[in-house]
């Protein structure tokens, strides 16, 4: 089989959360460029509409849905809207997330803890659950891709809530994978390292960012397109026998032992 056929997503319907900016936008582009109909879900309607028009301008199918990923009713309606437009979601990319303020663990408030865990963990589980239920009911095979982080493997000061959530996403991925594999629904995760986005570009270009870059064996930060390979592998038939895995895309940062 040719590589172009192996990674072809024609006939698939993909839903991407956090699609209005950063990595989410790139995930939408990569999925659409390889044949999937895409549903863009986020809270910023104007950004979603602009991306939808961009995707449609390439003769790809897209629908924009304004929804809060922590609102289970809103997300159920989002899945309904996608089904009405394109059919059952067969690819879910659980990308929406937030970072915490740089607060030491003993200073994290209950409000911030619950906010970070609510978006970065709870929403991942419940939206995966919703997608899986619908795939099973429709008799569809599918792929759920959860976005974790290298902070799911190691921690840094001031990241307690975020690191806990991202580590739990990896275990959630494994738990769901074991229970859904028998029906042909694969569940995997991607753990990005430091990627330059509109949210963190000023920080990563600062002196502090330069120090982080020096600790990356490949000597650079990730670019948004650097995640396309992992995404398409897990979304397509190229990854048909992969489930419960977490692919680390970090330029070698996690494996390095500082001496």
Label each residue range with its predicted role.
Residues 1-5, 99-102, 154, 232, ...:
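Short C-terminal tail/terminal secondary-structure segment
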Residues 13, 20-21:
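Conserved glycine-rich cofactor-binding loop
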Residues 87, 220-249, 254:
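C-terminal substrate-recognition "lid" of short-chain dehydrogenase/reductases
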Residues 103-105, 109-117, 212:
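Substrate-binding pocket helix/loop in short-chain dehydrogenase/reductase
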Residues 128, 165, 173:
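Active-site helix of classical SDR
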Residues 133, 178-182, 240:
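Alpha-helical segment proximal to the catalytic Tyr-Lys
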Residues 149:
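Residue(s) in the substrate-gating loop at a strand-loop-helix junction
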């Amino acid at each position: 089989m040719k590589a172009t056929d192996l990674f072809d997503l024609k006939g698939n319907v993909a839903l991407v959360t956090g699609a209005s900016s950063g990595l989410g936008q790139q995930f939408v582009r990569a999925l659409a460029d390889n044949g999937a109909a895409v549903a863009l879900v986020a809270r910023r309607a104007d950004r979603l509409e602009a991306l939808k028009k961009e995707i449609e301008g390439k003769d790809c199918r897209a629908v924009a849905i304004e929804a809060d990923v922590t609102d289970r009713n809103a997300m159920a309606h989002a899945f309904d809207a996608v089904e009405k437009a394109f059919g059952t979601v067969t690819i879910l990319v659980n990308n929406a997330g937030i970072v915490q303020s740089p607060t030491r663990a003993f200073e994290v408030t209950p409000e911030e803890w619950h906010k970070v865990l609510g978006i970065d963990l709870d929403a991942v589980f419940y939206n995966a659950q919703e997608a899986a239920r619908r795939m099973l009911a429709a008799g569809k095979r599918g792929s759920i891709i959860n976005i974790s982080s290298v902070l799911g493997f190691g921690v840094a000061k001031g990241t307690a809530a975020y690191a806990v959530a991202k580590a739990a996403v990896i275990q959630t991925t494994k738990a769901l994978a074991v229970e859904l594999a028998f029906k042909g629904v694969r569940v995997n995760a991607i753990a990005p390292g430091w990627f330059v986005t509109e949210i963190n570009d000023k920080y990563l270009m600062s002196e502090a960012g330069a120090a982080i870059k020096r600790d990356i064996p490949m000597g650079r930060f990730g670019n948004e397109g650097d995640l396309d390979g992992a995404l398409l592998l897990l979304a397509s038939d190229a990854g048909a026998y992969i489930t419960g895995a977490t692919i680390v895309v970090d330029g070698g940062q996690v494996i390095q032992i500082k001496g």
